[in-house]
Amino acid sequence: MGKLTLLLLAILVWLQYSLWFGKNGIHDYTRVNDDVAALQATNAKLKARNDQLFAEIDDLNGGQEALEERARNELSMTRPGETFYRLVPDASKRAQSAGQNNR
């Protein structure tokens, strides 16, 4: 009976070692779970960005407001009868902000 108990104990130790330290053991399992969580977070961010880009594409394809906004912002276009005003800070504020940017 003693040899059988010793054999079963040796098998139990070997199985526990395999479970904790072997290939596909607990350490590998937790590492893979951490990797999966990080990749899922990255995928969620990328999906949100893709959804935003698809919404912008739909707006550009069908909506005139987005086209008008881009023309106004990027090309400085105005409608007939409108006057475009550009506000330029005075020289002292420009010099002060330039001094802060050089720091």
Swiss-Prot record:
GO biological process: FtsZ-dependent cytokinesis
Periplasmic face of the membrane: 22-103
Keywords assigned by UniProt, alphabetized: Cell cycle, Cell division, Cell inner membrane, Cell membrane, Coiled coil, Membrane, Transmembrane, Transmembrane helix
Mode of membrane association: Single-pass type II membrane protein
Segments on the Cytoplasmic side according to the record's topology features: 1-3
Transmembrane helix in keyword set: yes
GO cellular component: cell division site; cell septum; plasma membrane
Stretches that traverse the bilayer: 4-21
Entry similarity comment: Belongs to the FtsB family.
Assembly notes: Part of a complex composed of FtsB, FtsL and FtsQ.
Protein name per UniProt: Cell division protein FtsB
Gene source species: Shigella flexneri
Record lineage: Bacteria, Pseudomonadati, Pseudomonadota, Gammaproteobacteria, Enterobacterales
